[in-house]
Regions:
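Extreme N-terminal leader/targeting segments of oxidoreductases
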Residues: 1-5
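Active-site substrate-recognition segment that forms the wall
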Residues: 6, 13-24, 33, 41-53, ...
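Conserved beta-strand positions in the Rossmann-like core of class I SAM-dependent methyltransferases
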Residues: 29
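Dinucleotide-binding Rossmann-like beta1-alpha1 core, especially the glycine-rich loop
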Residues: 46-128
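Helix-loop-beta segment of a Rossmann-like dinucleotide-binding subdomain
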Residues: 55, 81-92, 118-155, 253-257, ...
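Short beta-strand to alpha-helix junction loop
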Residues: 56-67, 95-99, 137-153, 262-267, ...
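Helical element adjacent to the flavin cofactor pocket in flavoenzyme catalytic cores
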Residues: 137-184, 188, 192, 196-197
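C-terminal catalytic lobe of FAD-dependent flavoproteins
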Residues: 286-385
């Protein structure tokens, strides 16, 4: 029996899910509203991949750690061209007291921590050309990936069909299948649907209750410089990427529910200011430029920073929840989305591990609705672990 699924959205979430499903025997139709894949928040020249931990949120840190370890190991195995990814390390600059507290917390959680992270010291600063008075953490497996190269690689499969210029207007349920209608009056039918279109997911009746905020993000870049630059991803108030495709990318600004598509000089100035503590010479170089390239895109996020991964309730057919949600990854999309796509594939294939169930309980898309129904405990225990 053929297994067919429609996936709405061809960013990192949709492409990752298509990849895992196709490799497990599904025929996937990937529907994208733009003229190509990875055109939204997944379309920047580089995506930094490193774990962003919280000081007092153990559940979030567990999820972050699982996602980061899965994604970096998985990308290494994919067979991407060597110029399209690198995991030589990443530095997160933090206040010294905060870094020390975080180091203590992570040391309890991570075995063989010396292989995973280190407190920044003088030798690390010298090696990676960072300002000498900095403090923070060095993540040994952190790095970056070329987003478009990764997404293109993921959908290069005979079971995946890509259909662009398809802006989905509605999702409707008949007796045994879902019907997706586009603004151009086309229809697509399938027994299974996955919604992976970031902040646009609220447009559907089925998912309009899922809270989301759209964040406008602007990045900038400068072409290669004549002086030495840090060879790894370095993050402070903003991030600075190493030379990739003859560009040093840095940023990013974030503005909630701001839908201005134009590059802003004020945001460029903010991005330049955000790298001042990382590399003073590069900061001065950027300050002296008359014009700097950039890009604007939107990311979706939730109130609690947790993505939506799992089943969406069908109000009329609660027993047949064959619509899945995979969205709202915020700025951590390339860290979270591959792992969450893998877990969602296991849900669709009815092949969940105990760890998968823990993740789906944590990312349950219906958590806010269940809490409003005084079912807070149920929201985090949809799957028995």
């Amino acid at each position: 029996m053929q297994k067919n699924i429609l996936i709405i959205g061809a960013g990192i979430a949709g492409c990752s899910l298509a990849h895992f499903l196709a490799n497990s025997g599904w025929n996937v139709t990937l529907l994208e509203s733009e003229d190509g894949i990875a055109q939204g928040g997944s379309g920047n020249p580089v995506a930094a991949i490193y774990p962003k931990f919280m000081l007092n949120d153990e559940a979030y840190n567990d999820f972050m750690l699982k996602s980061f370890r899965f994604t970096t190991a998985w990308i290494r195995r994919l067979g991407l061209n060597e110029v399209d990814y690198r995991f030589d390390g990443a530095i997160e600059i933090l206040e010294e007291a905060y870094a020390q507290k975080l180091e203590i917390n992570l040391s309890r959680k991570i075995t063989k921590k010396e292989n995973f992270f280190s407190l920044i010291n003088e030798s690390i600063l010298n090696k990676y050309l960072i300002e000498c008075n900095s403090s923070g953490l060095f993540f040994h497996q952190g790095g970056w990936v070329n987003p478009i190269a990764l997404c293109s690689h993921l959908i290069n499969h005979s079971n995946i069909k890509i259909v662009t210029h398809q802006k989905i207007k509605s999702i409707e349920k008949s007796i045994d299948q879902w019907t997706l209608k586009t603004e151009s009056q086309k229809t697509f039918n399938s027994s299974h649907v996955a919604i992976c279109n970031a902040s646009s997911v609220n447009q559907f009746d089925l998912t309009q209750h899922l809270h989301t905020d759209a964040f406008r993000g602007q990045i900038n870049w400068i072409n290669s410089t004549s002086f030495q630059m840090p060879p790894i991803v370095t993050c402070d108030e903003g991030y600075l990427a190493p030379l990739i495709q003859d560009k040093h990318v840095f940023g990013a600004t974030y503005a909630m529910n701001d839908f201005n598509k134009d590059l802003r000089k004020s945001d460029t100035k903010k991005n330049i200011a955000s790298i001042k503590k990382i590399h003073r010479e590069f900061y001065n170089h950027c300050e002296a430029q008359k014009s700097i390239h950039g890009r604007v895109a939107w990311r979706a996020s939730t109130k609690d920073r947790k993505p939506y991964v799992g089943r969406v309730f069908d109000n009329q057919l609660l027993g047949k929840m064959r619509v899945r949600e995979l969205a709202r990854f915020g700025s951590r999309g390339f860290t979270f989305a591959p792992y969450c796509s893998y877990v969602l594939t296991n849900l669709i294939n009815d092949n969940l591990s105990q760890e998968d169930k823990k993740t789906l309980n944590y990312t349950n898309p219906e958590r806010y609705r269940l809490k409003k129904m005084s079912l807070k405990k149920v929201a985090s225990q949809v799957f028995r672990v």
